[in-house]
Amino acid sequence: FQGPLNFSFDPAVLSAYIAELKQLEPTVTPTLATFYHLVQLSARKEAFINELPMETINPLYKTILGEFSVKRWLAADAAQVEWNEEEAAYLLEIVKALDEQGIKLLVGSDAGTMYMPPGSSTHDEMTLMIRAGLTTRTVLAAATINAAETLGVADRYGSIEVGKVADLVLTAGNPLDDLQTLRRPLGVVKTGQWISEEQLEALRESGRHPSNFYISLGRLLEDLLRRALQ
């Protein structure tokens, strides 16, 4: 939107660019969730932050994000909020147009930006792709087989087939009917190893206790020093 379309909301400009883009046979990762996050920060401010699983974010990283990215959007005025909301709505239209023209899409949330937690932000991304008008089958393909094909590992990953690595999720409902069932799986098979619902909850609980600020700062400084001496 910012680049090729030069902030234009003109459908004709979008159509012409997608026609040109299609000649390249590209793969596109929309990252709708990160802009949605930006919109919510600018519009709802602290009320939105209070709804986020902030306990899962490393405290050092949280401080850095707050200073260098979040603060800007918390200070957004009404005019900026209106622009953000208009752009967010048009981003959905762009994704729908890309899909209609047969552009291969991937699921990627850009987790880690602006207090976006990994994991749940991927589900948010898929929800937004549905909101854009894509089918659940298209979104699931974008999260699985499309990604495997793009990375060149579709012979081993991306679908449930004989001979492929056993990576799959067991859900209470059919994701083709409702993607939200993926948010609380009954179990996961990772490289053939069964991870039960209880074990998944234990992993979630562990994620709520990241390393503390000073240990993280020490590790960061150690890494920077190591890089400087290379």
Predicted regions and their residues:
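Active-site microenvironment of metallo-dependent hydrolases
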Residues: 100, 127, 137-230
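Active-site neighborhoods of metal-dependent hydrolases
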Residues: 1-132, 223-230
